[in-house]
Curated annotation (Swiss-Prot):
The keyword Phosphoprotein does not apply. The lineage of its organism: Eukaryota, Viridiplantae, Streptophyta, Embryophyta, Tracheophyta. This is BAG family molecular chaperone regulator 6, mitochondrial. It is found in: Mitochondrion. SMART domains: BAG. The keyword Mitochondrion applies. Disruption phenotype: Mutant plants display enhanced saline-alkaline stress tolerance. Its main location: mitochondrion.
């Protein structure tokens, strides 16, 4: 079968009054009964949302900062424990005698104090809490060094009748405080009083009074 072309020549005509069933198809002359209404829609600008990558990075950084603070606080706490141990040693009379009589003991104790200071210097002070704790422990160790130097600078044994100076005497020289000293012994009686007492004891009346023969 061959192809063919179809052309329509139909025309539609409506009533001239513009009224009727098909009056809405006219381009002009129709009355619009539905007027468009304007509705206001509020438009809000949403806040900038943080991308998932940025939120994850912030959480990782916060966790890492917390880890650093805990590690630095543990280092300061360890240095404080070492300072407490050295302070207890320095309060013992055996330690005082050892550091004053032996050069090696003196160097060993001094190196222990310097090692504590080096441990504190290795702790960074980025965070305020860690910085304040490190400063307090550093002051404590410096005070121990001053006491240690005062122990070494105490008077020799010859000034104390052959007995080394105690830590109480050293602290008395530093702070001007001393424990309550025992009262001095009473002076011996004069020779004349001793002779009179011996004569009284040798007399027969007193011997009879005390039950002697």
């Amino acid at each position: 079968m061959g192809s063919y072309h179809y052309t329509s020549t139909s025309h539609f005509f409506f009533a001239g009054g513009g009224e009727g069933e098909y009056s809405s198809y006219k381009g002009t002359g129709s009355t619009d009964t539905h007027r468009p209404t304007t509705v206001r829609i509020p438009v809000t600008t949403p806040g900038p949302e943080r991308p998932p990558d940025d939120a994850a990075a912030a959480r990782i950084q916060a966790a890492f900062r917390g880890h650093l603070v805990r590690r630095h606080a543990a280092a300061v706490r360890g240095a404080d424990d070492e300072a407490t141990r050295l302070e207890r040693l320095l309060r013992r009379q055996e330690t005082v005698d050892a550091v004053r009589g032996d050069e090696r003991e003196r160097a060993r104790f001094s190196e222990a104090l310097m090692a504590v200071l080096l441990r504190l210097d290795a702790v960074p002070g980025y965070y305020p809490a860690v910085r304040e704790a490190r400063r307090a422990v550093t002051r404590r160790v410096v005070g121990l060094q001053e006491v240690f130097d005062a122990v070494l600078a105490a008077p020799d044994a010859a000034d104390t009748c052959g007995v080394p100076a105690s830590l109480d005497q050293v602290l008395e020289g530093i702070w001007g405080e001393s424990p309550a000293a025992p009262p001095p012994p009473p002076p011996p009686p004069p020779p004349a009083a001793v002779e009179v007492e011996e004569e009284v004891v040798r007399s027969p009346c007193w011997r009879r009074f005390f039950g002697g023969v």
